C-alpha cells in the first residue's frame, strides 16, 4: 500500500507541475532566436517572440522587460504589450516613413521618468481604471470574498502552495473580471469626486478597425500600445485565448468576429452607452452586476472571479460605464441638447441605434430567473438588488471605512442622490475620469457668457492633429477648455490639469473660485476698464496709440476691448504679441519591432553557437517573472537539417506531449544516434514544431532529457508557434493544419541566408503536412524523410522503400556527407551526383533467354 501511495503521490505531483506549466495565468515562454552572420559582417535575426503570462494588472511604468545575455545584463530593453508579448521600441529616423497604426507605440516607460508617479504617490490610483471602487472598498470586497471560503481550505492552500502558486493566486485576485464588475453609485463616489490619474488606458491604437476606432478628440489617454485590456467569453478552455491571433514574425492581434453594420439593442439586454463627441454622458440604461459593458448577460461564478458572457463571439470589453444618473439629471442633460431623454442608444462602434420609447430605463431582472439564481452563492447579491436592502443588510456589503462609504440607506428614495453628492451645499469638483470630460475649442465667447452652445463649441473644436501642428493654440485668447460640461479658459484649466498630473490631487474649491475670479473674464467685470481710463492722462493715451500703431506696422496683433457705457473715442488697447512664424518641433514617432538591427546585434557581442538569454519583468503584484531562451549565431554558409518534434522524435503526436512529462521515454529508437552522427558531419539542427510558445520550457527540457547510448540530441534553435496554447492545439489537432505555421516560419528563416543559396539540406517529419511545408521552402523529395508511429522511416522519393532511424544511421556518410570537405556536386546539385548521373547504366537483359 505504501508503494501504491507513493506512486499516486508522484503521479499527482507530476500532473500538478504539468498543469502549473500549462496554466494560462502563468503561461510564459520565449522562442529561440537565430542570428545569421552575412559575408559582409552584417547580421540578420529571426523575430524575438517572448510572451509573459496574464499581466493585465500591471501599470505602464512596470511594463519594461530587462534582458540578460550569458548572465550579464545588456543595455537593451523591451516593452510589454497588451497580450503579454514583448517587443522592441524603435524611433523612426524619418518622419516620411509610413507606419501602420497598429505598429505605432509610445516610448519605453522608464521608472525614473517624472511622468510616472511613484508607488507612494499613487495610493488608490494605482488600481486599474476598470476597478471602479475606492481603495478601502476594494480591500473590503477582497476580505469578504476570502471570508466566504472555509477556513480549513485556506490553511490547506497556505500549507501546500508553492511561491509560484501564491503568485498566480495573487494575480487572479486582481484579474480583469474583478475590475470590470460594475459598482453601485455610492461606491463610485470617491473616484467621481477627485481627479484620479489613469495608469492603465483600455484599448490600444491599431487594434480597432477604422470604423470602430475612437477619434482623436474622444481619447483621454495617450495612444499607448501596452495597455489593451481584452476580455473574451471563456465558456470552454478551447476558446479561452482563441481571440488573439499571433502569427510568426508578427505582433498579436485581436481576432474580431464579423459584426453587422447596425446593432439593435435586444429586449432584456442593456447596451453600452457611449455618447457622441462633445455631448453629455447620458446612459440610457442602468447596468446591473449581471450585465457587461457591451450589453451581454454575464454569468457570475460562485467564487466571483470570472465573468463569462453568454455569446460565443470574441468580445472586447470597453471602459467602465458611468455611474447611473438620476431621472432628474437625465432629463436635464437631455434637455440641454434639445433631445428627448432615452431617444438614442450608442453601441461601442459608435453606431447610433434608436431605442423604443416604451423601453424601460432599467433592465428588469427578477430574482426568480433561473439564469440569475443558478450562479448566486449563499452570500452573493446582484448590484441592482442593493437599493431594496435595509440599512442592516447593506452594512454587510459596505462596511464602515476611512473613506466614509459606510452603510447607506438604500431603501430611501433620496439615497442615490445623497450618495452622489454628500455635500449638496458645495458644488462637486470636475473630474477627468470619463471619456468626454475634457475638450478644446477656439469658439471664444467666455467674456460674454459662461454658457456656450454645444453647436458653437463643436464648430471650432480643436483636434489632436490641430494641437500637434500648432501647439501655440494654447495661447490663443479664444481657447475654451470644456471639463465636465463647464467651460474655462486656459489660465484656469491649466492649474487643474497640472495639479492632477503632478500631485494626483484636485484643486480645492476655494482655489478654483479664486482662479475664476482672477482669470476668467466676465461680461459684467469690464467696469474696471472705465475707472482705469479715467485716470489716464491725455498724453499717456496719445503715447499708447502711437506705440500701438508702431507695433501694428511690425505685424503684431492687437485687440480692442470697450464697454457698452463708455464713449467710442476712448478704447483700451491690450497688446497681444503674435506667435513667431516658426515650424513646431516634430514629436518623435516610435514603432514596435520584433527584430534587432545589425548594429544592435553587433553590440550584443554574441558568441558563435548558443547564447543564453533571459527576459525578465518585475511587477508589484507578481515579483519578477523570467523567460529563458537561446540566441544561436550561425554563418551564412551553414547547412541546416530540419526536424519536427511531435511524432518525429516522439512516437506519436498526442502522447508525445503527456508521457515524457510523466517520466516515460516515448522516443523513437535510433533517432538520437542518427542526429548525433549528422551533427558530427558539420550540419546544424533546427527544431520546428507547432507547439505553443507557452510550452517552450517543457519542449526544451524534453529535448535535453532525451538520451540514448550516451548521446543526446544536437543543440539547435527550437522554433515554436507564438500563438496561445489552445490555439496551437486547435490548429494542430482539430484543424490539422500545422503547415500554416511551419511554412511561414521556415520561409522566414530561409530569408536570413539568402542570397547565398539554399540553407536547408534535409528534413524529418511524420505527416503529409510536414512534407508540404518542406517542399514550400525548396527541399527536394530525395532528402525529405517521414516516420510513422511504428518507427518505419520512408523517403518521399522512394515511398515503397521503408527503413528505420538505426539503418539510416549506418549510411549517414552517404546521405549526409561531411560539410567540412567543402562544396561538392553531391551537396550543391544532387541530380549530378555519382549515384544519379555518373553511375554506369544497368546492362540490358533479355528476359526471353531467362526462360
UniProtKB/Swiss-Prot annotation:
The modification Phosphothreonine is found at residue 159. Its main location: nucleus. The modification Phosphoserine is found at residues 161-162, 224, 463. InterPro entries: HAD-like_sf, LIPIN, Lipin_mid, Lipin_N, LNS2, LNS2/PITP. Its cofactor is Mg(2+). PANTHER family: LIPIN, PHOSPHATIDATE PHOSPHATASE LPIN3. This is Phosphatidate phosphatase LPIN3. The lineage of its organism: Eukaryota, Metazoa, Chordata, Craniata, Vertebrata.
Amino acid at each position: 500500500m505504501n508503494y501504491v501511495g507513493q506512486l499516486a503521490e508522484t503521479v499527482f505531483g507530476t500532473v500538478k507541475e504539468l498543469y502549473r506549466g500549462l496554466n494560462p495565468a502563468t503561461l510564459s515562454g520565449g522562442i529561440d532566436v537565430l542570428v545569421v552572420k552575412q559575408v559582409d559582417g552584417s547580421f540578420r535575426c529571426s523575430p524575438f517572440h517572448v510572451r509573459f503570462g496574464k499581466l493585465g494588472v500591471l501599470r505602464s511604468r512596470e511594463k519594461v522587460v530587462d534582458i540578460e545575455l550569458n548572465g550579464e545584463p545588456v543595455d537593451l530593453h523591451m516593452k510589454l504589450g497588451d497580450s503579454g508579448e514583448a517587443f522592441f521600441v524603435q524611433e523612426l529616423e524619418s518622419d516620411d516613413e509610413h507606419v501602420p497604426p497598429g505598429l505605432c507605440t509610445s516610448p519605453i516607460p522608464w521608472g525614473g521618468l517624472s511622468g510616472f508617479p511613484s508607488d507612494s504617490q499613487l495610493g488608490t490610483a494605482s488600481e486599474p481604471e476598470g476597478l471602479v471602487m475606492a481603495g478601502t472598498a476594494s480591500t473590503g470586497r477582497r476580505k469578504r470574498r476570502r471570508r466566504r471560503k472555509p477556513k480549513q481550505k485556506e490553511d490547506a492552500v497556505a500549507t501546500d502552495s508553492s511561491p509560484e502558486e501564491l503568485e498566480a493566486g495573487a494575480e487572479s485576485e486582481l484579474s480583469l473580471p474583478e475590475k470590470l464588475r460594475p459598482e453601485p453609485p455610492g461606491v463610485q463616489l470617491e473616484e467621481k469626486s477627485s481627479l484620479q490619474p489613469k495608469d492603465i488606458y483600455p484599448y490600444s491604437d491599431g487594434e480597432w478597425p477604422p470604423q470602430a476606432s475612437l477619434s482623436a478628440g474622444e481619447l483621454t489617454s495617450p495612444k499607448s500600445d501596452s495597455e489593451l485590456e481584452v476580455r473574451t467569453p471563456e465558456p470552454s478552455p478551447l476558446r479561452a485565448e482563441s481571440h488573439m491571433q499571433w502569427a510568426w514574425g508578427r505582433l498579436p492581434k485581436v481576432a474580431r468576429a464579423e459584426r453587422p453594420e447596425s446593432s439593435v439593442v435586444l429586449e432584456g439586454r442593456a447596451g453600452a452607452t457611449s455618447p457622441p463627441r462633445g455631448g453629455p454622458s447620458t446612459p440610457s440604461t442602468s447596468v446591473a452586476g449581471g450585465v457587461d459593458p457591451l450589453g451581454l448577460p454575464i454569468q457570475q461564478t460562485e467564487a466571483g472571479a470570472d465573468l463569462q458572457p453568454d455569446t460565443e463571439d470574441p468580445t472586447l470589453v470597453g471602459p467602465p460605464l458611468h455611474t447611473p444618473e438620476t431621472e432628474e439629471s437625465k432629463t436635464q442633460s437631455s434637455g440641454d441638447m434639445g433631445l428627448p431623454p432615452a431617444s438614442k442608444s450608442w453601441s461601442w462602434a459608435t453606431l447610433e441605434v434608436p431605442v423604443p420609447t416604451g423601453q424601460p430605463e432599467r433592465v428588469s431582472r427578477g430574482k426568480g430567473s433561473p439564469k440569475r439564481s443558478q450562479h448566486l452563492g449563499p452570500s452573493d447579491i446582484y448590484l441592482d438588488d442593493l437599493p431594496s436592502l435595509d440599512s442592516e443588510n447593506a452594512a454587510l456589503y459596505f462596511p464602515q471605512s476611512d473613506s466614509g462609504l459606510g452603510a447607506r440607506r438604500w431603501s430611501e428614495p433620496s439615497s442615490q442622490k445623497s450618495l452622489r453628492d454628500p455635500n449638496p451645499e458645495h458644488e462637486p469638483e470636475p473630474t477627468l475620469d470619463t471619456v468626454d470630460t475634457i475638450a478644446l475649442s477656439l469658439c471664444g465667447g467666455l467674456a460674454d457668457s459662461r454658457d456656450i452652445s454645444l453647436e458653437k463649441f463643436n464648430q471650432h473644436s480643436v483636434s489632436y492633429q490641430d494641437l500637434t501642428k500648432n501647439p501655440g493654440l494654447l495661447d490663443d485668447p479664444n481657447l475654451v477648455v470644456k471639463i465636465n460640461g463647464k467651460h474655462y479658459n486656459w489660465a484656469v484649466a491649466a492649474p487643474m490639469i497640472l495639479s492632477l498630473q503632478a500631485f494626483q490631487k484636485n484643486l480645492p474649491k476655494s482655489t478654483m473660485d479664486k482662479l475664476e475670479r482672477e482669470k476668467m473674464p466676465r461680461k459684467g467685470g469690464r467696469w474696471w476698464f472705465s475707472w482705469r481710463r479715467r485716470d489716464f492722462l491725455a498724453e499717456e493715451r496719445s503715447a499708447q496709440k502711437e506705440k500701438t500703431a508702431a507695433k501694428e506696422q511690425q505685424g503684431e496683433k492687437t485687440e480692442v476691448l470697450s464697454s457698452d457705457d463708455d464713449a467710442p473715442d476712448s478704447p483700451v488697447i491690450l497688446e497681444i504679441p503674435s506667435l513667431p512664424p516658426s515650424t513646431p518641433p516634430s514629436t518623435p514617432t516610435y514603432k514596435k519591432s520584433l527584430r534587432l538591427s545589425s548594429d544592435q546585434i553587433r553590440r550584443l557581442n554574441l558568441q558563435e553557437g548558443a547564447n543564453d538569454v533571459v527576459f525578465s519583468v518585475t511587477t508589484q503584484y507578481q515579483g519578477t517573472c523570467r523567460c529563458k531562451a537561446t540566441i544561436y549565431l550561425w554563418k551564412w554558409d551553414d547547412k541546416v537539417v530540419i526536424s519536427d518534434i511531435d511524432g518525429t522524435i516522439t512516437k506519436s503526436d498526442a502522447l508525445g506531449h503527456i508521457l515524457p512529462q510523466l517520466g516515460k521515454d516515448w522516443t523513437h529508437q535510433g533517432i538520437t544516434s542518427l542526429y548525433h552522427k549528422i551533427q558530427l558531419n558539420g550540419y546544424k539542427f533546427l527544431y520546428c514544431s507547432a507547439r505553443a510558445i507557452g510550452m517552450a520550457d517543457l519542449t526544451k527540457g524534453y529535448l535535453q532529457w532525451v538520451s540514448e547510448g550516451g548521446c543526446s540530441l544536437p543543440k539547435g534553435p527550437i522554433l515554436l508557434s507564438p500563438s496561445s496554447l489552445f490555439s496551437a492545439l486547435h490548429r494542430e489537432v482539430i484543424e490539422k493544419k500545422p503547415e500554416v505555421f511551419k511554412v511561414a516560419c521556415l520561409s522566414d528563416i530561409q530569408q536570413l541566408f539568402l542570397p547565398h543559396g539554399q540553407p536547408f539540406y534535409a528534413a524529418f517529419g511524420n505527416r503529409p503536412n510536414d512534407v508540404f511545408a518542406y517542399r514550400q521552402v525548396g527541399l527536394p523529395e530525395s532528402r525529405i524523410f517521414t516516420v510513422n508511429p511504428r518507427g518505419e522511416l520512408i523517403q518521399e522519393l522512394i515511398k515503397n522503400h521503408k527503413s528505420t532511424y538505426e539503418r539510416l544511421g549506418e549510411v549517414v556518410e552517404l546521405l549526409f556527407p561531411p560539410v567540412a570537405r567543402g562544396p561538392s556536386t553531391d551537396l550543391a546539385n544532387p541530380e549530378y551526383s555519382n549515384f544519379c548521373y555518373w553511375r554506369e547504366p544497368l546492362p540490358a537483359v533479355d528476359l526471353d533467354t531467362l526462360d
